[in-house]
Amino acid sequence: MKTAMTNELKNLIHGRESYIVHFGPDLIMKRPLPTLGDDARDAWLNKQHHTKNTIDDIRAVDNPRYNIPRMIFIKDDEYQLLEECAPGYHLTPELFKTLSRRQQYEIIDGIASFLVDMNELKPVQDLQKHKIADELKFDKLDHFIENKMHRWFDADEIKQMAQIRDNIGTFEYETRPAWSHCDLNPGNVLYDQKTSTLSFIDFAEANYNFIYRDIFAPLQIELNIFRPVYETYCRIHND
């Protein structure tokens, strides 16, 4: 039985929780993996309803600078949904480098516009204190200081670095959580060169998050456009 299930999965286009079936060039049916138990299938279904609600909200903004593929329906009793395909290809650094300067500018403008619109879908929350240490991989830094620095640095330099680490651990600042996509990476953003269409997909993780997290998300870091996205975000937000 297990072998048969494994062979079945090999024939599916699937991710960690879902598999998809294409209906022509424009539509996708999505269902939970057959390996999921009842609780996991129900959790999957709840996530799809959360996704659809977020998609419907951001589509209602109707911003022409970007595209949000429509989730057409969810059938709870059959654990399946139907949604539109996003045109184009995943927005990787390799693709971005081949685009014209105009297209690159439009992408930067589209990302910033999307971020502003997402942040404004729901009320921004109150200021919260946030430690810089929470953003850094302190375990790796600790390991380097304690176990590897002695190979290249003397005792005084190691002591100085340890003091810097300890000081950073106490730094904190105030910031506001805002409604965000929370999973912006090249796998969830597509671009169609022929139509200059920028599409955002996969809103399963949408939630309140610190504003800068989506501004400096993996997508912008990998494309090396985080600075112009930030500047454009500020300009649009302040208009």
Task: Go through the PLM ranges and name each one.
Residues K2-A4, E120-C182, D192:
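An alpha-helical support segment within catalytic cores of ATP-dependent transferases
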Residues L81-Y89:
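Short pocket-lining segment of the protein kinase catalytic domain that shapes the ATP-binding cleft
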Residues A178-W179, D192-N238:
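Active-site Asp-x-Gly
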Residues T3-G24:
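ATP-binding glycine-rich phosphate-binding loop
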Residues I28-L81, T98-I111, E222:
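A conserved alpha-helical element in kinase catalytic cores
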Residues D56, L115, N119-P123, L219, ...:
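Protein kinase-like catalytic domain
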Residues Y89-H130:
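Conserved kinase catalytic-core helix
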